[in-house]
Amino acid sequence: MSHASAAQQIESLRESIRHHEYLYYVQDQPEIDDLAFDELMRKLQRLEAEHPELITPDSPTQRVGGKPKEGFAKVAHSRPMLSLDNVNSEEELRDWERRVREQAGQNAEIEYVCEYKLDGLSMALHYRDGQLARGLTRGDGEIGEDVTTNVRTIRSVPLSIADGKLQQAKMPANFEVRGEVVMPFTAFEKLNEEREAQGLAPAANPRNAAAGTIRTLEPNIVAQRRLDFYAYFALTEKGEDAFGEQEEALDALATLGFRVNQHRHAAKSIETVVEFVNRAEEHRSRLGYEIDGVVVKVNSAVLQRRLGYTGRAPRWAVAYKFAARSGVTQVEDIQVQVGRTGKLTPVAWLAPVQVGGTTVTRATLHNADEIERLGLRIGDFVRIERGGDVIPKVVEVVDDAEHPRGTKHFHFPHACPACGSEVVRTPGEADYRCVNTDCPARLRESLLHFASRGVMNIEGMGEAIVMQLLGRGLVKTVSDIYSLTEEQLVSLERMGKKSATALLGEIDKSRQAPLDRVLFGLGIRFVGERTAQALAEEYGSMDALMQASREELERVNDVGPRVSEAIREFFDEPRNRDLVERLREAGLRFTGEKRKKTSQLAGLTFVLTGTLPGLSRDEAKGKIENAGGHVSGSVSKKTNYVVAGADAGSKLEKANSLGVPVIDEAALIKMLETEQA
C-alpha cells in the first residue's frame, strides 16, 4: 500500500471511530455494536503500526499514553476556579435571588439557568488549534494539577475538534472548557466488584472513586474505568467569557461534541427555579450518576460581570444543596460481624445521625486495613456517607490529629466472635475469615442469602424465622429447608397454620429456580449473580460445572484465576459435594437451558422503567433473559423496546424522542407467551 493510500485510509478510519465514539459516549445512541467498533480500532492500529510516521496525537489509538514521569505538574488557572456559595432551603434560595435583584437593579430583566449539580471532580480543558492540549484539576482554585495523560483516556472528551464545528459553534481555535468528571453508577459498581474480588475495601462513593482515578499515575487504569466529562462553561484562552449567555455556551459546547447535561432549564422567575429544584430532587434517584443539588446561574454574561464576586465565590451563581447524604457523628463501639463465607467485617456503632433523610446508627468499616488507614478509634468523631441504597460508610475521622479524651484502640479478634474458632488471613487478602464451617453465624447468613430475593426467593423466610429454625436445631444446612414440615413450622413463634402452609408453598416453588440461582445460592466465594449466570449458560448443568478444571473455568466470562480457584476449592470439599447431592435429592433444578439462539426475543434489547403492576423489576428482567433477550439500563437507538410502568421517568421521555417502541407489562407478557408457544 502506498503512503498516500495508507494516509487516506487512516484518516477515514479515524473519522469513523470519532463519529461512533461521539454517538456512544456522548449521545448514548450507538449505531454499531462493540464488535464492529473494535474491528475499526484494530484496522486503525494495524495501519498505524505499518506506518508509524502517520501517527498523530489526536488519533483514537493515542488516548492511552505513557505514565507521567514524576507525579503531576502544578499549573495556574487562566481564571480562578471558584467554589459556589451554598443554600439549603427555599427561603435561602429566595434570599439569594432578592440580593441579585437588588444589586442588578429592580427594573433589570433577569433570566436564570438551572443545571443539575454533578457530584464529581471539577476540570479545566485547554484546546490549542482545536486540539486537546491540557487538562487541569481544580486544585485550590488558583493552581491545579496537570492530568492531561489521564483526561485523554476519557472517551467523552474530544481529542480534536474540526474547523467546521468550531465555526458552527462560533468558537475560536484556542479556548478553555470547564466541566465535571464523574463516575457513573454502573462503572462504580463494577469497580467495587473488582475491588472486592481482590480483597480490597470498596470505594466509598462515586465522587471519591472519580477523584482517585483521575489522579492515578497509571493511564491504562483510568481508561478501564469509564469516567465521563460533562461540560458546563466556556472561556477564551485568556480566561474571558466566550459567549454572551450561559445557555448559548451550553449549546455551543454540545455542537463541539462535548457531553452537556440535558437536565437544565431557563427560568424567568424564582418560582420557576424552585419548581425545577423540587423536580430535580425527585428525579435524583433515577439518574445514572450522582447529583447533590442544582446550580442556578444568571444567564447574561454582562450581568454576571456587573454582579461580580465576593472574596471566594461569584454573586451571580449559587448551589442549592439537597439534603446531606453525609453527616458527622461519634463511634460508640466497633463490633465484628461474620458473613456466610466466614469473612469478619468490623461495623461501627454510631450515635444516631440523620443522613439523607434516614437515621443512621451503623456503618461498615470493611476490614482491619481500613480501620488502620482511617486511624480510627472507638470514641472518635467520623464523617459518614451514603448514596442511594448504598450501605453507610465511614469516610474519614474528623480532626484525627487530636483524638477526643477517652478514645480506645480497636484490636481485631484472633478468634471468631460467634463460635470462638481460629480466624485466618490469607496472604494477599485484606479479610480475616472464620474457618469453622459449622459456625452458627456463617450458617445464619448462608440461610438468609439462600432464601433471599434474587437467589431462591423464599418469601417469608426472614431473619426471625431463620433464627428460630437454627435455635431449635431444625436446620443445619440450607438443604434442611426442604425437609421442614408443617408441624415443625407451626411450633415456631408467630407462625400459625396458614403462615406455615404459605411458607411451605414458597419453599416448594423455589425448587423450580433456574440453575444460575441455585449456583448463586450455594455461596461460593466470588461467585455473584452475574458470574453464576455466566457459568450456568456455559455448562448447562451442575454436573458439568463440578467436573470443570480451573483452566476450563477461566475461559468463561467474569471468571479469573481467583474465582476459578474458589469454585474448584468449593466443589473439591466433600462436605460441599454432599450438600449438592442433598439439594439434588430435594428436587432442585441442576440443569439449565443455554440461551436460545433462534428465540423470538434473541438479540432484542429491552429497557425497564417505572413500576410494573404484576412483575418486579428482577422478575421481568429474568423472564426476558430466559427467553433470550437482553435488558439494558439505558435507552439508545439500539433499544428495541422500552417496557414502561407507573411513574416512568426520563427513560420513557428518551424513548419517545428516539422513536423507540414503548410497551406495557401486558404486551411484554404476550411476547413471552408467544415465545413459549
Swiss-Prot record:
Gene Ontology BP terms: DNA repair; DNA replication
GO molecular-function term, one example from the UniProt record: metal ion binding
Binding-site residues, NAD(+): 34-38, 83-84, 115, 138, 180, 297, 321
Gene3D superfamilies reported for this sequence: 5' to 3' exonuclease, C-terminal subdomain, 6.20.10.30, BRCT domain, DNA ligase/mRNA capping enzyme, Helix hairpin bin, Nucleic acid-binding proteins
Enzyme category, top tier: ligase
Coiled-coil portions: none
Keywords, alphabetical: DNA damage, DNA repair, DNA replication, Ligase, Magnesium, Manganese, Metal-binding, NAD, Zinc
A Gene Ontology cellular-component term: cytosol
Recorded catalytic activity of this chain's protein: NAD(+) + (deoxyribonucleotide)n-3'-hydroxyl + 5'-phospho-(deoxyribonucleotide)m = (deoxyribonucleotide)n+m + AMP + beta-nicotinamide D-nucleotide
InterPro entries: BRCT_dom (IPR001357), BRCT_dom_sf (IPR036420), DisA/LigA_HHH (IPR041663), DNA_ligase (IPR001679), DNA_ligase_AS (IPR018239), DNA_ligase_CS (IPR033136), DNAligase_adenylation (IPR013839), DNAligase_N (IPR013840)
EC number of this enzyme: 6.5.1.2
Catalytic residue list: 117
Residues binding Zn(2+), per UniProt: 416, 419, 434, 439
Classification via Pfam families: BRCT (PF00533), DNA_ligase_aden (PF01653), DNA_ligase_OB (PF03120), DNA_ligase_ZBD (PF03119), HHH_2 (PF12826), HHH_5 (PF14520), Nlig-Ia (PF22745)
Similarity remark: Belongs to the NAD-dependent DNA ligase family. LigA subfamily.
Function according to Swiss-Prot or TrEMBL: DNA ligase that catalyzes the formation of phosphodiester linkages between 5'-phosphoryl and 3'-hydroxyl groups in double-stranded DNA using NAD as a coenzyme and as the energy source for the reaction. It is essential for DNA replication and repair of damaged DNA.
This protein's name: DNA ligase
Species this protein is from: Acidobacterium capsulatum (strain ATCC 51196 / DSM 11244 / BCRC 80197 / JCM 7670 / NBRC 15755 / NCIMB 13165 / 161)
Lineage: Bacteria, Pseudomonadati, Acidobacteriota, Terriglobia, Terriglobales
